[in-house]
């Protein structure tokens, strides 16, 4: 009885402390003129719902920022009251890191800041607010200026998390990662200062922002180099019909050889299977269907027999964004529908030898027997001789995977009205482990935009940032020594 009473008293005290903290932070925000989300309102209910409903967290308060000054004041209030701060742009983090990955943060909700502030038609540089989502930014740049940037395929993803950690999509082989378009930023630091960062100003901070940006501050303005929106693209697909392990092994190895040595910049593609047991190739080609067929024929000539080339579709830029969005529109200014899932990733220099054998064995022997929910894998061609991603070295930005040919996403989803079972984590864990055990540690990593929150902080930052981790730890100690922008897989400050 006594222990139960002490436990209950502790819970009451903790709850009271949380209320006091919430009252204090909301009072500070209000005094500074920062809009806040009030519990029970529609805004609060929208902003507190995570994309991955498996990982709900409750912030101490939500600052609904609408200006750079609001962001600055929010960080200053958090510093004053010794609260951790997390910035949420689109809210699409697989690990709910926009909430802080735990309860009790001050959440800076950025998605009321969605404007393209300015565009310079001489330089092609656009200044963009941090809460815009990819589809909205693509729509505005295309419709108003006839311009584009390289980015991922999910239109509801916020630009800030996407850009800050790389940003891969069906334009990356042609135009590089989303982060490669970043030429400057306006950042609110942990001490509340507002600074500019670029290749010539605060260059060390700029380096860290380009690949590990969530660790150092909140970007209030992204300055992006755009390119002319393409007028002719081709959506293509190939049904592979791999009926046995031998054909799958030969097929993946054929794709690897083509991707590494032959595939021109214009070919952006992946192998994917969406739980049906029949993988295919899908992608975008920057040019006409006839040009795609000529460019892709060397791969078709080496694939195992039985494949079927699907009809192609000619698209303009914004149609191509819509084509792979899985929605009927792309101009998202509110969150995407929620899901209930666990995901993992790999970045690989190669998937030949025992690595591909283990991948295929697991696919046929384990994965294809999982029939009670939706799962998928995507083997994206990330690097290769002609990939624009590899034209930048690992040392030039904080993004450390440019020497990797493959970016793989593994995704396991239950219905939203179900509970993701503890016993199901072993499905993807086992698949990833089957591959990595066959490779030296230097030949693989993981991608934080497909975050796996079950990894501890030190292991996660090692696989996310690889050879750049030590430099990032020193930058963290310089710009955020008290870990104000902490989340469970944030870089540690180490002097």
Curated annotation (Swiss-Prot):
Keywords: FAD, Flavoprotein, Glycoprotein, Metal-binding, Nucleotide-binding, Oxidoreductase, Secreted, Signal, Zinc
Glycosylation sites: 244, 417
Keyword Metal-binding listed: yes
GO CC terms in record: extracellular region
Dependence of activity on temperature: Optimum temperature is 50 degrees Celsius.
Group of enzyme by EC: oxidoreductase
Pfam families: BBE, FAD_binding_4
Post-translational modification: The FAD cofactor is bound via a bicovalent 6-S-cysteinyl, 8alpha-N1-histidyl FAD linkage.
Record location of the 6-(S-cysteinyl)-8alpha-(pros-histidyl)-FAD (His-Cys) cross-link: 92-154
N-terminal signal peptide: 1-22
Co-factor binding details: Binds 1 FAD per subunit in a bicovalent manner.
Activity vs pH: Optimum pH is 5-7.
MF term (GO), any: beta-D-glucose oxidase activity
Domain FAD-binding PCMH-type: start-end pairs: 55-229
Subcellular location per the Swiss-Prot or TrEMBL entry: Secreted
PROSITE patterns: FAD_PCMH
The protein's required cofactors: FAD
Family membership noted in the UniProt record: Belongs to the oxygen-dependent FAD-linked oxidoreductase family.
Function, as annotated: Catalyzes the selective oxidation of C1 hydroxyl moieties on mono-, oligo- and polysaccharides with concomitant reduction of molecular oxygen to hydrogen peroxide. This results in the formation of the corresponding lactones, which typically undergo spontaneous hydrolysis. Carbohydrate oxidase is able to oxidize a variety of substrates including D-glucose, D-galactose, D-xylose, D-maltose, D-cellobiose, and lactose.
Protein name (database record): Carbohydrate oxidase
Organism: Microdochium nivale (Pink snow mold)
């Amino acid at each position: 009885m006594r222990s139960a009473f002490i436990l209950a008293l502790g819970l009451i005290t903790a709850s009271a402390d949380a209320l006091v903290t919430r009252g204090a932070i909301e009072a500070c925000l209000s005094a500074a003129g920062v809009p806040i989300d009030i519990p029970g309102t529609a805004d609060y209910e929208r902003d507190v719902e995570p994309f991955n409903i498996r990982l709900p967290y409750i912030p101490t308060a939500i600052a609904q920022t609408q200006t750079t000054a609001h962001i600055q004041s929010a960080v200053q209030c958090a510093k004053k009251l010794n609260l951790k701060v997390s910035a949420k742009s689109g809210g699409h983090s697989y690990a709910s890191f926009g909430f802080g990955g735990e309860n009790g943060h001050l959440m800076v909700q950025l998605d009321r800041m969605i404007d393209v502030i300015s565009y310079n038609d001489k330089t092609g540089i656009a200044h963009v607010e941090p809460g815009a989502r990819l589809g909205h930014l693509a729509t505005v740049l295309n419709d108003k200026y006839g311009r584009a940037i390289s980015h991922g395929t999910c239109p509801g993803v916020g630009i800030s998390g996407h850009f800050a950690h790389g940003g891969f999509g069906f334009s990356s082989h042609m135009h590089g990662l989303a982060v490669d378009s970043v030429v400057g930023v306006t950042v609110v630091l942990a001490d509340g200062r507002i600074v500019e960062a670029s290749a010539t100003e605060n260059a060390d901070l700029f380096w860290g922002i380009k690949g590990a940006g969530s660790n150092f501050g909140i970007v209030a303005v992204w300055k992006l180099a755009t390119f002319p929106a393409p007028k002719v693209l081709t959506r293509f697909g190939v049904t592979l019909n791999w009926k046995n392990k031998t054909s799958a092994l030969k097929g993946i190895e054929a794709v690897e050889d083509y991707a590494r040595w032959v595939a021109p910049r214009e070919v952006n593609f992946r192998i994917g299977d969406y739980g049906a047991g029949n993988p295919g190739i899908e992608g975008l080609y920057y040019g006409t269907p006839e040009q795609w067929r000529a460019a892709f024929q060397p791969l078709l000539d080496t694939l195992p027999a039985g494949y079927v080339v699907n009809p192609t579709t000619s698209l303009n830029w914004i149609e191509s964004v819509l084509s792979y969005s899985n929605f009927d529109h792309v101009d998202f200014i509110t969150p995407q529908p929620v899901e209930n899932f666990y995901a993992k990733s790999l970045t690989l220099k190669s998937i030949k030898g025992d690595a591909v054998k283990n991948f295929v064995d697991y696919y046929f022997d384990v994965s294809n027997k999982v029939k009670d929910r939706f799962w998928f894998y995507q083997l994206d061609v990330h690097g290769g001789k002609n990939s624009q991603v590899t034209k930048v070295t690992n040392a030039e930005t904080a993004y450390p995977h440019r020497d990797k040919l493959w970016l793989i996403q593994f995704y396991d989803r239950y219905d939203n009205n179900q509970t993701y079972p503890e016993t199901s984590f072993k499905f993807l864990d086992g698949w990833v482990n089957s591959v990595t055990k066959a490779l030296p540690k230097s030949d693989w990593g993981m991608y934080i935009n497909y975050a796996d929150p079950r990894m501890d902080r030190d292991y996660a930052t090692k696989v996310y940032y690889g050879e750049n981790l030590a430099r990032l730890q020193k930058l963290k100690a310089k710009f955020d020594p008290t870990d104000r922008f902490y989340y469970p897989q944030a870089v540690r400050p180490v002097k």
